[in-house]
């Protein structure tokens, strides 16, 4: 569990924590949404920080709300090194209560890509970048043109 290994915990510096910070994000941020989640983001020069809002309207049981937050924190922890700087607040929607953990994680990654916070994945089946081939020296048997 994360409590036994402090290196695996989600650091305080990577969280939106106070009401004032949430208010700034909600008032000045751009928004994009998915059937499961809504993302409010504000770009900046600061390291990326995550805030979550999972209300009782989403799931009346604390177990369900905590599961959603746990999945989002874990996904954010893995994406933190490649994430653009700024504040990101995720608002869970009621459909998230019935979604599986991979569905929630995929929706989160999809929203971050749509926001431009993550690089787009390479399209499957695309060719790798072309290598530059240096012209070889002419062979002594072939005539030069």
From Swiss-Prot:
Pfam families named in the record: Ribonuclease_P
EC number(s) on file: 3.1.26.5
A GO molecular-function annotation: ribonuclease P activity
Superkingdom of origin: Bacteria
Sequence segments annotated as region (Disordered): 119-145
PANTHER family xrefs: RIBONUCLEASE P PROTEIN COMPONENT
Official protein name in the record: Ribonuclease P protein component
Lineage: Bacteria, Pseudomonadati, Pseudomonadota, Gammaproteobacteria, Lysobacterales
